[in-house]
């Protein structure tokens, strides 16, 4: 039997140039998209700095330590951000301290304890809270929450007044227009952000780690404590910083709640005054004149830098593993 020799299949040349060209175009488009956010941030920073410098040069007060903010006379500008920083920091940190433990608890409940028929609608309700307008939170805070908090504020002031956070502030406790009230309202506002991100991070905990812990006899709480929470640490930090960013920049709700103060702040939760954002919003009518406008833009630039420092600190705390 004669067998025919095997013949090699003919090689067909494939032109890879269109694919390579498409890859280059896609890489260029992706790089351009990635560069857009960097360019936008740089442009914003340059705009703020350029508009702020003339007013800073004309300023007759120390920008960082002065409690004045007088822009009524172009020739005698005197403004500083000491009180703005104090009110912003106290209200935002109060919100963070109150919101994060509750948000983490809700996230753990939704991912590891709640039955599915309850988890989804409850999670949707938490997410829906983020859609409530800021002005609604502000009105609810000053008309509903503030009167309820007044007895608590008086109790804290009476019994813990020796501690600087609870001593008598620069506004009356009556009416509740204090940092204490603003911080609690802000904690409700940032709750959905921290909860939503923490929930998604906890859901990504490797199933094999959870099953291994259960196989070793761990209870559900021990699984959460030793597996879920350590795995989601950097995600919770990232969520907290996003919530803090929201609190730092919140304007309308804080403007509605906080009572203006005639005296400098004392680093008490029972002080009134303005945050960076609410001070800028309250003076929109002055933005027709360059130098007074520049004074408020200077405050905006300080807030801009503060948010960057907060995010840098978050990455350092999370060991560089903060996502987002």
Curated annotation (Swiss-Prot):
Tell me the Gene3D superfamilies matching this sequence: MetI-like
The ABC transmembrane type-1 domain sits at 85-314
Q: Where in the cell is it found?
A: Cell membrane
A GO term, aspect molecular function: phosphate transmembrane transporter activity
GO BP terms in the entry: biological process involved in interaction with host; phosphate ion transmembrane transport
Q: Which residues cross the membrane?
A: 30-50, 90-110, 125-145, 174-194, 237-257, 290-310
Function, as annotated, reads: Part of the ABC transporter complex PstSACB involved in phosphate import; probably responsible for the translocation of the substrate across the membrane.
Q: Which family does it belong to?
A: Belongs to the binding-protein-dependent transport system permease family. CysTW subfamily.
Q: Under which name does UniProt file this protein?
A: Phosphate transport system permease protein PstC 2
Q: What is the lineage of its organism?
A: Bacteria, Bacillati, Actinomycetota, Actinomycetes, Mycobacteriales
